[in-house]
Amino acid sequence: LPILDSFEKYPMKSQLDNKEILGLSGNILTEYQDAKHLSDTDVQASGLIKQFIEQYPKEHTMIQKFFNIFCNRELSRLPASRVFKNGLRFKQRQGTFLVAQQNRVLLRLTTPNASMLFFKGRWWETLVAHKVRSWSQKRPNSPEVWQSVLFQTEGNNPRTKNEVDVLLNNQQKLIFIECKSGQVTQNDIYKIDAVRETYGGDI
């Protein structure tokens, strides 16, 4: 920014929000959740899921395989209940999700998002977003934190282009956080590389 009477130049200082930065880069937002609105119920449920996975890894794997293979990772295809070998079973009904074995409760969640958090792995994304939000709230101007950010492809194709798990606007630099709670596959590496190719930056 030049000062006319002295012809001195000073750097301009401005703050752009996430929508402005993404808009300038030509990306179309389809959907996102502001981490400011994360519910305490979902954060607590995510913590319980984490404890369950750490304490009962075999049981979690069995239930998750059923969802991945027989439900094709679609929540709409999940049955109201399912019984596995060794008396393991899960049941979901009206915002309550239950995992039990031999009449012993291993996990009980009470939130409308229970199935999404458990089966889609959103529990880890939620915990990460919660931590980043807590950090942001302690910073000047509270940098924006978004979760589950979806972008649209170019043209008329409504297909989702990319999903960013957690997006942080830190001093005009967008930080993309990929959340993985399990094994990292080659597809995950490709996804991160695609984000770099689309939005720039380093890995």
Please provide the spans of the model-predicted regions:
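Intrinsically disordered, low-complexity Ser/Thr/Pro/Gly-rich regulatory segments
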Residues: 2-203
